[in-house]
């Protein structure tokens, strides 16, 4: 028999003690504030991997990202506020891409994200 596999490309991972705003708050500047975020919460990364292994066709590539894509600035300012951290400083970088990663296959397979708003109490 041939080798069959699934490839799952996960977005930036966050959850529990892992949150990118903790590192970004320490940087002198974060570029491209209007770019969308492409993140996934740890509980959804695990849940999606299990869900795909049980229900999805093999020999496919999937993108594991939350369905919500606010701008970097909106998301990280709100996250910093909720975590009582200093807000990152932002600057434009016109050469950077504004790519939203979605996966209609994941949506059509019916996975229900547990943390679609990536753990924020309030959304920007």
Task: Pin down the residues of each PLM region.
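Conserved beta-loop-beta element that borders a ligand/cofactor-binding pocket
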Residues: 1-16
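Amphipathic terminal alpha-helices
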Residues: 97, 117-124
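Conserved beta-strand segments of alpha/beta enzyme cores
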Residues: 4-6, 60, 86, 112
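Amphipathic alpha-helical segment in the mid-to-C-terminal domain
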Residues: 42, 72, 111-114
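Short aromatic-enriched loop/helix-cap "lid" or pocket-rim segments at secondary-structure transitions
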Residues: 18-22, 75-77
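Structural element of the ATP-grasp superfamily
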Residues: 1, 105-107
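Alpha-helical substrate-binding/gating segment
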Residues: 21-29, 34-62
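Mid/C-terminal beta-alpha module of Rossmann-like enzyme folds, strongest
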Residues: 46-102
């Amino acid at each position: 028999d041939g080798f069959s596999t699934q490839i799952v490309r996960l977005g930036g991972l966050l959850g529990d003690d892992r949150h990118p705003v903790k590192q970004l708050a320490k940087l002198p500047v974060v570029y491209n504030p209007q770019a969308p975020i492409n993140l996934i919460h740890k509980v959804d990364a695990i849940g999606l991997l299990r869900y795909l292994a049980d229900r999805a066709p093999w020999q496919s590539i999937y993108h594991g990202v939350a369905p919500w894509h606010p701008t970097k600035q909106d998301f990280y300012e709100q996250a910093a506020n909720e975590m009582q951290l200093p807000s990152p400083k932002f600057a434009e970088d016109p050469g950077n891409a504004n790519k939203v990663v979605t996966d209609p296959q994941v949506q059509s397979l019916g996975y229900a994200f547990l943390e679609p708003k990536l753990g924020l109490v309030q959304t920007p």
